[in-house]
Amino acid sequence: LLPILFISVIVPVSHSKVVVFDQVTTVQTPIKIRVLTRGGFFSEGGRMVDIYLDNNLLKKILTGGDGYGYLKYTSRGPGLKKITARSNTDSASGRILVLNDNEKAIIIDTEGAFKDTVFSDEFRESSQKAVTSLSENYKIIYLSRFLGKGITGIWLEKQNFPKSVILRWRGPKTLENLKKNSVQLHAIIGSSDVISAAKEQIEKRFSFEKTKDGKTVKDWDEILKLLQSPLSHPKRNDYSDEGE
């Protein structure tokens, strides 16, 4: 029911012929930028793709037979980076969230944490204000279980939520990959199923649903009281980034 309700209140998303996957890492921790080229609904390999970081060309890559292409990337400075992939007349963008070693992240399962916003303008407003407040002290990582990055991103932007990455939820493996990149996971907010899957990875787990594997909260104000604490961010300098 929830995915249908979400789709009914936002603009439908077309199927792009190029896909850029959002990622999260830390300064000086290498990752592989991942793109996918498609022909209609199916993967289409063997295409040249130009990869740009904030409109600066990093490198040209060739996608494999499965349509996927990769580029090793190491960020020398923190921030939310824009990655654009262009192949012929097709293009798409994604984001890479880069954290300093002392920065902490809060994960938000969008379908689980924001489901009541479909029915209540008041809850939608309180959700937006709470996440914006949390983003002043923590980095926000959004999860999408069913709808995908495109639909979720349009909805978040429409509701003026803080900009950040949107990761596809793949169970505990998603959290393991984040920790492998040295990302400090401070808390997770979402459905009872998601926080149950996170019980071995994240200590602070909150849900608006009944759960035995975390704390059930009544509203976003309660979450703010439990999570809001000062976090000093180091002064950011200008760094150059590199792709290999």
Show where each model-derived region lies.
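Conserved, compact domain cores that house catalytic/ligand-binding motifs in diverse enzymes
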Residues: 102-183
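Fold-independent oxyanion-binding glycine-rich loops
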Residues: 51, 110, 191-192
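Beta-strand-enriched, solvent-exposed domains that form extended recognition/catalytic surfaces
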Residues: 13-103
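Solvent-exposed, well-ordered amphipathic alpha-helical segments
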Residues: 11, 43-47, 53-55, 84, ...
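Bacterial N-terminal signal peptides
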Residues: 2-9
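Generic structural hydrophobic/aromatic packing signal, biased to beta-strands
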Residues: 35, 51, 85, 96, ...
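Short alpha-helical interface patches
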Residues: 56, 81-86, 112, 223, ...
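C-terminal cap/substrate-recognition subdomain and adjoining C-terminal extension
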Residues: 147-244
